[in-house]
Amino acid sequence: MLQKYYVATPVGGHATLGPRRIAKQLGLIAALLILINIVAGVAHVLGGNRYYDLARMFILDGENNIPTFFSSLLLLAAGLVLASIAAIKTQEADRYAPHWRALSIIFVILAFDEMVSLHEMFNHPIRQLLGVDGVLFFGFVVLAIPLVMILAIIYARFLIHLPSHIRRIFVLAAVLYLGGQIGVEMLSGVYFESNGSTTVAYLLITTVEESLEFSGIILFIYGLLSYAARNLREIRLSFEEAG
């Protein structure tokens, strides 16, 4: 049973990192980025272009910046853990191995999308094609909502077979992540359409949105590691000093 995760130390021993500690460390990084985002965003709104570079580097709603990189790493980490679970489930001939594998692919795609903002490319074409605005101002949600519903149907039995505490974690993680990625995004579209993005109110809306996404991904990673710790055979990674 996988109970702890081992990493090398300079003295040749090992340090242990459990799911809770990993999630806590990731949460602290996320909280720091959220705080810096608020400071940088308010400085930009009140101080104008003098603080543009600061805001561009740390604003949560920005692109190709530090928070985006961190979010991409979280999604990629989830994808890699899912891939590891899928590999073991495949060896065990588990009936749900394809579900784990598909999830790993989905999260790697999400990580790539987060880094290059691929979904943003759909906003204007969909808005023009369907003539939507308001809560659908960010047009990609028109595609996201039915895709999420289809995945929910496909993964219903998969969720039911999971241990109850893991199922609760996964469901809550999905609610948090999708609540930010789709729910609050729709509300921000209404505000953005009328008021633009350079306001404290919009900063707060997008901060809530991205905070929910951070929380959902980190909780999901915690759930994945907890599942591995309780349900999979032991995996130990050892690193030997070179030379």
Predicted regions, residues:
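Short, Lys/Arg-rich, polar N-terminal cytosolic tail immediately upstream
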Residues: M1-G18
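Hydrophobic cores of alpha-helical transmembrane segments in multi-pass inner/ER membrane proteins
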Residues: Q3-K4, P67-S84, V142-I153, S211-Y227
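Alpha-helical transmembrane segments of multi-pass integral membrane proteins
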Residues: I29, H99-F107, S164-G189
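Alpha-helical transmembrane segments of multi-pass membrane proteins
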Residues: A30-Y51
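Interfacial helix-loop-helix junctions of multi-pass membrane proteins
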Residues: L46-N49, H119-L129, L187-E209
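Short aromatic-rich membrane-water interface segments that cap or initiate transmembrane helices
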Residues: R56-F70, Q128-V142, T199-F214
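Membrane-proximal helix-loop-helix units in multi-pass membrane proteins
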Residues: A111-I153
